[in-house]
Amino acid sequence: MSILVVTGTGTGIGKTVVTAALACHARLAGLDVAVCKPIQTGTRDGDDDLAVVARLAGVEDLHSLAKFPEPLAPLAAAHRAGADLPSRAALDDLIAAVDRPGRLTLVEGAGGLLVEIGRGGVTLRDLAEDLRAPVLTVVAPGLGTLNHTVLTLEALAHRDVRSEGLVIGSWPAQPGVAEIDNRDALARLGPVRAALPAGAGTLSGTDFERLSVQAFDEAWVRGLVG
């Protein structure tokens, strides 16, 4: 399987735009690519992450298992909708069914790595462990990011889940001392695969394609496909 799980050090960190950029790069490189977002919340306000991926990346093979209207953590959003979260088996089966030989399957989580997304406390880390998939972590550039990043990487290492590196989800146009120093420090924690500029999600299709091609190393992206 060629599954890459995309998580973040928090909510609103840029996971969806990073997922879209990586999917766009893979598509333009001629790779077969699919995107899964097993759990989505906040859809009542038109916040559909897979629709964002489709618009930005031009990828049509998109999959989700459960959508809840309120912009809350998955468990709270499910309960307020009178529903349960999916089972661990259902989440695993969704992703396994999408993946196939020669395909890059991107799986975007909801919130951070250890947020409950399945019944019984199942997290994105559990799914990565089940599927033997590496994890790409989207991080912030500002103050606090080093602690959050280390906690996420340690949580992965605790379960022997391989880290595929880091992506800075929103790099400011005028970075300050903290951001510049943090970028160097993040690179010591793991390979920084890309740093997407702030506002990347507002770009037009052509501009987003150009950004996606430039943002990631093509050899690394191709190497994700086993």
From Swiss-Prot:
The active site is at residue 37. Its main location: cytoplasm. Keywords: ATP-binding, Biotin biosynthesis, Cytoplasm, Ligase, Magnesium, Metal-binding, Nucleotide-binding. It comes from the Bacteria. Substrate binds at residue 41. Its EC number is 6.3.3.3. It is found in: Cytoplasm. Mg(2+) binds at residues 16, 49, 108. The keyword Membrane does not apply. It catalyses: (7R,8S)-7,8-diammoniononanoate + CO2 + ATP = (4R,5S)-dethiobiotin + ADP + phosphate + 3 H(+). GO terms for biological process: biotin biosynthetic process. Its cofactor is Mg(2+). GO terms for molecular function: ATP binding; dethiobiotin synthase activity; magnesium ion binding. Gene3D superfamilies: P-loop containing nucleotide triphosphate hydrolases. ATP binds at residues 12-17, 49, 108-111, 169-170, 197-199. GO terms for cellular component: cytosol. Homodimer. NCBIfam families: bioD. Belongs to the dethiobiotin synthetase family. Catalyzes a mechanistically unusual reaction, the ATP-dependent insertion of CO2 between the N7 and N8 nitrogen atoms of 7,8-diaminopelargonic acid (DAPA, also called 7,8-diammoniononanoate) to form a ureido ring. This is ATP-dependent dethiobiotin synthetase BioD. It comes from Mycolicibacterium gilvum (strain PYR-GCK). The lineage of its organism: Bacteria, Bacillati, Actinomycetota, Actinomycetes, Mycobacteriales. The gene is bioD.
